[in-house]
Amino acid sequence: VTTPLLPPPITAVAAVDTTLRERGHGVLDPAGLHQCLGAPAHALDAWWGYWDRLAPDLHLRDGGHYRQRRHGGFIVDGARLTAAPHRAHWQPLEYNALHGGIERWFEPLEPGLVAEPLWPSLLLWLASRASALRGVQPWFIEAHPFRIDTAGGIGRPTPEGAHRDGVDLVAVMLVRRTGVKGGETRVFDADGPAGLRFTMSQPWTTLLLDDER
């Protein structure tokens, strides 16, 4: 018996900023994200190949080999997007008890991905959402393409468990699901028992989170 997936509550494009302010989170469906980027339907599917060429995550403290990723940083100042020098990813222990407190170096993003026409559109749009939430200012964006491989049994997208990232805004985008069971997303209030659970199943479904909440 297959348990049906619980779909996410979809946020209307016009209500994204209001929903983030009022609830601390919102979910765009694929059509909504493409609309926000001014792109035709399925345009982002051209990015799928980059997720076939991610590098092994060598920093998993649970001894696993199920996660591949790359990493890149960008600065958005107004309408200007600049690639930052490649650097380590670092989180304090208070936000990530398993992987915090160490410099984690990952392979950089492929130049081809950064050169994709919709790449700056996505990052500038996300920076605009952060400015709507916190006020207009320059933003530093870290991009983390992930791939979780379940071929060996169990893959853990977040082996550190429920945690905050210590940033202003988090965007979680589902690129694709292939041969995967589970993969449930859970959103928790930082200071209370309230929460939300659902499964993103359609490519380019996007969860936006006010990380402080």
Model-derived features with residue positions:
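Short, hydrophobic/aromatic alpha-helical segments in well-folded domains
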Residues: 157-158, 170, 174, 203
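Fe(II)/2-oxoglutarate oxygenase catalytic core
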Residues: 2-143, 151-154, 190-200
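A short secondary-structure junction signal
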Residues: 153-158, 181-187
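Short, conserved beta-strand element in jelly-roll/cupin
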Residues: 164-180
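Catalytic core of Fe(II)/2-oxoglutarate
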Residues: 184-213
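Conserved hydrophobic/aromatic beta-strand scaffold that supports enzyme active sites
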Residues: 27, 145, 170-172, 206-208
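Short, structured patches in soluble enzyme cores that scaffold and shape functional sites
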Residues: 145-147, 173-175, 189
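Conserved short histidine dyad/triad with adjacent acidic residue
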Residues: 145-164
